[in-house]
């Protein structure tokens, strides 16, 4: 019922100009920007007073599992938003508490008659918003919500797919190709508009409603390094300009070459800014659209140009009506794979102490900076789940949710189900080798040396497998394996073969139960990304991974190929079609698997 109410409100018309002057509150949540903010424009329209509010729960900040890097990014984004509002003779009101407790007080204290906010498609958000809308109605407050966090109306996609979300990217593309183009971004709120509805700003505003510091929220900042990613709309728009400066990749569908620089944070990366709404996905979409038409002389851009944004929409659509999307139990689209419970192995993976330098360097970068390349995410996700440790993807979701700047409910959980072969037509017989993949990407090992300085003196020949280095080399490097750096947590060659066989048996049992054929040729999600244009340069590759994963290498596999898949260079066969099984449809109960 809550979802129904929230969805209905999402399409509520904005009040027309000339409406009796309202006292409006615009509630910022994810859309931390002034550009393309239709809900903010609805708050301003016909209002005598507008206050821009962000509700922050200090108790949640102190007790949640979200890491310090994401909190820092959020606070920087709020500071930037407040700075932009100051230029419009307004301020951001950061109110401490929970929405259900805060709004009744604000409605009375400020005489609020209109509440506006951006529609939230995720299950928790819809439930929260339905409760607030009910509360507002009882208080006589008009509620206006506008959809600007996604390109499409997700409910319409589901309706066109027979009242269920499409569970393959190919099907998703087919649905949206029948829909109208996304709405264009709306204009920026102007100083003249804000001047006509100025709210009174008290002298003690910073003390009462200012953006708190990390220390005020209880985070220890001693030893915290400088932010690699600066939060805020201003930074997001500057990055977008840099992102689009390289016209060649749009014109020629250049596929970026994977190299060591690809693994480092790029100044054109956009994923955290899309996640927090510092950058409008619609602005990004149409800036890409316009640039393509300019370069290609008015040719209509193909869907593949927007691949990263569409992966994001795909996962949002799959999750919008599934509150169990981030867990196995009760999740109708998730195969119930009997994962092992191994807290010790999970902890070593999360802390970067697996004994595989490639995996440990990635997890160290994630913990330090809050971001890793999309293929690095694939590597560590495969290692934790079906590749080596056979630990549930749910554990990976929780770790990424803590550490990733760009993690959100839909994309994070969807990517983990996808990479662990738990949903979305993945191929279980391909594994990332925790030695070979890194070595092909960065033969010199500079990435390892950057994040694992203990190993910096190892020669490149041994830096990806230091346990094979002679004792003399280990001593010369002042790093004895098993003493100064851990031995490998598993034998990858043996474990990956065993796990591929386990996954094969699970799929065969499931196939017999459902009457499906594992060898049936079905459309693969790799077809749509045969031109992965959404990554403009090798240094940018993966910077938008939150907007959706890239497919694993694909192609028919012989028995020998299946056993040797651990050594397959990832990313080299992305444009080939896969032959995979059709996974269970949403009606499959968890117990049946």
Curated annotation (Swiss-Prot):
Expression tissues: Expressed in all tissues examined including fetal brain, fibroblasts, heart, brain, placenta, lung, liver, skeletal muscle, kidney, pancreas, spleen, thymus, prostate, testis, ovary, small intestine, colon and leukocytes. Highest levels in heart and skeletal muscle.
Biased composition (Low complexity): 537-548
Cofactor(s) required, per the database record: FAD; (6R)-5,10-methylene-5,6,7,8-tetrahydrofolate
Glycyl lysine isopeptide (Lys-Gly) (interchain with G-Cter in ubiquitin) crosslink, residue number(s): 30, 126, 242, 348, 475, 504
GO molecular function: blue light photoreceptor activity; damaged DNA binding; DNA binding; FAD binding; nuclear receptor binding; phosphatase binding; protein kinase binding; protein phosphatase inhibitor activity
Key words of the record: Biological rhythms, Chromophore, Cytoplasm, FAD, Flavoprotein, Isopeptide bond, Nucleotide-binding, Nucleus, Phosphoprotein, Photoreceptor protein, Receptor, Repressor, Sensory transduction, Transcription, Transcription regulation, Ubl conjugation
PTM section of the record: Phosphorylation on Ser-266 by MAPK is important for the inhibition of CLOCK-BMAL1-mediated transcriptional activity. Phosphorylation by CSKNE requires interaction with PER1 or PER2. Phosphorylated in a circadian manner at Ser-554 and Ser-558 in the suprachiasmatic nucleus (SCN) and liver. Phosphorylation at Ser-558 by DYRK1A promotes subsequent phosphorylation at Ser-554 by GSK3-beta: the two-step phosphorylation at the neighboring Ser residues leads to its proteasomal degradation.
Span list, region Required for inhibition of CLOCK-BMAL1-mediated transcription: 390-489
Region (Disordered): 532-593
UniProt subcellular location: Cytoplasm; Nucleus
Residues with Phosphoserine modification: 90, 266, 299, 554, 558
Domain of life: Eukaryota
Predominant cellular place of this UniProt entry's protein: cytoplasm
Task of the protein: Transcriptional repressor which forms a core component of the circadian clock. The circadian clock, an internal time-keeping system, regulates various physiological processes through the generation of approximately 24 hour circadian rhythms in gene expression, which are translated into rhythms in metabolism and behavior. It is derived from the Latin roots 'circa' (about) and 'diem' (day) and acts as an important regulator of a wide array of physiological functions including metabolism, sleep, body temperature, blood pressure, endocrine, immune, cardiovascular, and renal function.
Family of the protein in this entry: Belongs to the DNA photolyase class-1 family.
Name by which UniProt lists this protein: Cryptochrome-2
Organism, as annotated: Homo sapiens
């Amino acid at each position: 019922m809550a979802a129904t109410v929230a969805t209905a409100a999402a399409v509520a018309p904005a009040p027309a100009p000339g409406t009796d002057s309202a006292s409006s509150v615009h509630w910022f949540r994810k859309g931390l920007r002034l550009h393309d903010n239709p809900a903010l424009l609805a708050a301003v329209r016909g209002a005598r007073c507008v206050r821009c509010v962000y509700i922050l729960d200090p108790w949640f900040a102190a007790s949640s599992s979200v890491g310090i890097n994401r909190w820092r990014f959020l606070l920087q984004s709020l500071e930037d938003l407040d700075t932009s509002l100051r230029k419009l003779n307004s301020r951001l009101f950061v109110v401490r508490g929970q929405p259900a407790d805060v709004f009744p007080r604000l409605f009375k204290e400020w005489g609020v008659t209109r509440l506006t906010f951006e529609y939230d498609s995720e299950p928790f958000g819809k439930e929260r918003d339905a409760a607030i809308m009910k509360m507002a109605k009882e208080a006589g407050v008009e509620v206006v919500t506008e959809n600007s966090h996604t390109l499409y109306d997700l409910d319409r996609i589901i309706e066109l797919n027979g009242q269920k979300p499409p569970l393959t990217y190919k099907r998703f593309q087919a649905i949206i190709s029948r829909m109208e183009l996304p709405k264009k971004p709306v204009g920026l709120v102007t100083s003249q508009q804000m001047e006509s509805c100025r709210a009174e700003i008290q002298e003690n505003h910073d003390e009462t409603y200012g953006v708190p510091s990390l220390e005020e929220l209880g985070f220890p900042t001693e030893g915290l390094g400088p932010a690699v990613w600066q939060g805020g709309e201003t930074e997001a728009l500057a990055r977008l300009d840099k992102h689009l400066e390289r016209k060649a990749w749009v014109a020629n569908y250049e596929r970026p070459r994977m190299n060591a620089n690809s693994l480092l944070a790029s100044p054109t990366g956009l994923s955290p800014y899309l996640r927090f709404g510092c950058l409008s996905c619609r602005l990004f979409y149409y800036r890409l659209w316009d640039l393509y038409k300019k370069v290609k002389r008015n040719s209509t851009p193909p869907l593949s140009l927007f691949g990263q944004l569409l992966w994001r929409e795909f996962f949002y659509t799959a999750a919008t009506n599934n509150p169990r999307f981030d867990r196995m139990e009760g999740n109708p689209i998730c195969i119930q794979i009997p994962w092992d419970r191994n807290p010790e192995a999970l902890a070593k993976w999360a802390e970067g102490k697996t004994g595989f330098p490639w995996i440990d360097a990635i997890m160290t970068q994630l913990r330090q900076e809050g971001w890793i390349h999309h293929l690095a995410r694939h590597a560590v996700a495969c290692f934790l789940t079906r590749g080596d440790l056979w630990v549930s993807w749910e554990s990976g979701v929780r770790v990424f949710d803590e550490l990733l700047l760009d993690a959100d409910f839909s994309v994070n959980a969807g990517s983990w189900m996808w990479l662990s072969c738990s949903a979305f037509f993945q191929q279980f017989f391909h594994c990332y080798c925790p030695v070979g993949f890194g070595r092909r990407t960065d033969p010199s090992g500079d990435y390892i040396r950057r994040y694992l300085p203990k190993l910096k003196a190892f020669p490149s020949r041994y830096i990806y497998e230091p346990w094979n280095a002679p004792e003399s080399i280990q001593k010369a490097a002042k790093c004895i394996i098993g003493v100064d750096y851990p031995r490998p947590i598993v034998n990858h060659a043996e474990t990956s073969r065993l796990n591929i066989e386990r996954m094969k048996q699970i799929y065969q049992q499931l196939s017999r139960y459902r009457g499906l054929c594992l060898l049936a040729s079905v459309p693969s999600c790799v077809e749509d990304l045969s031109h992965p244009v959404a990554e403009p340069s090798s240094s940018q590759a993966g910077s938008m991974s939150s907007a959706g994963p890239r497919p694993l290498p694909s192609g028919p596999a012989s028995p020998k190929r299946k056993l040797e898949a651990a050594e397959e260079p990832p990313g080299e066969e992305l444009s080939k079609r896969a032959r995979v099984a059709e996974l269970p449809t949403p009606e499959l109960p968890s117990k049946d698997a």
